[in-house]
Amino acid sequence: MYKVQYLVLFLSVLLLLTMYVGCETKASDVKEMTKTRALVVENTTREVLEIYAKKKLSSTDLLLLENLNKDLDKNTDLNKKAEIARKLSAKWYDLGYPAIAGAYAEMLAEWFPTPEAWSIAGTTFGQAIPQKEDAKVRDFAAAHAVTAFENAISLAPEDWTNKLNLALVLTEVPPQDNPMKGVKMLLDLDANYPDNARILFHLGRLAIQTGQFEKAVVRLEKSLKLDNNQPQIYCLLERAYRETSISDLADKAAEKCRNSIK
């Protein structure tokens, strides 16, 4: 989990479109929703998340976590504390609680603020965002992921991967006062990095989500041409080809899609 990687999120663009082109929302209502979300995030902490998560854990896992937390509290050497925090982050991640794992990764980044440390924290938080069944956890993770990626960008502004990951988070959980912010960031990234396979991949997926299938074909084909080691792209291409009535290419993409998930 500590290898810096591209954050892969399944964009909930239907929600974004509902907010953007649906019924007109009064500015006061938007401000109130934004205030409510901020309050929820403020009242949600790692400690609160741990209380609820521990109710579902085995006695063995509880004992291990308790001992690690005791070691974390009693140690004064920052390097030793960092090693314990890494173990706690890894354990919570393995248990299926990426938001809590992200909080410990965030702790590490605060102690040793490097671009990589903040990127790891943001990526870890990002893994909790698709957990839509718990809005509090999702909003908590998204808010902390945004902060982590912004910190990473401030330390390494030339690194486009953190900018991409930030855009993906903002597309997945759009700010209520600026729902198109993530999409605009993706388009800006494409303008600044026109031959970037990963950016084109996500723009192609976004185009499919929004029904712009011809645009999706162009973006995904260009992405694949730039990087042919993207097995997951064929599943998207199949859909784009089908919707644009390119049946022969859709069939070929479908076969490659099936092979990629075997």
Question: Which stretches of residues belong to each language-model region?
Answer:
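Residue-level recognition of tetratricopeptide repeat
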Residues: 114-115, 159, 193-196, 213, ...
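N-terminal leader/linker segments that initiate helical-solenoid repeat arrays
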Residues: 2-99
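TPR alpha-solenoid repeat register
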Residues: 84, 117-118, 162, 199, ...
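Structural signature of tandem alpha-helical TPR/SEL1-like repeats
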Residues: 62-65, 95-103, 137-148, 174-188, ...
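Short coil/linker segments at helix-helix boundaries
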Residues: 42, 48-52, 73-74, 78, ...
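Residue at a conserved register position within TPR or TPR-like alpha-solenoid repeats
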Residues: 92, 124-125, 170, 207, ...
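Structural marker of alpha-solenoid helical repeat scaffolds
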Residues: 111, 155-156, 191-193, 225-227, ...
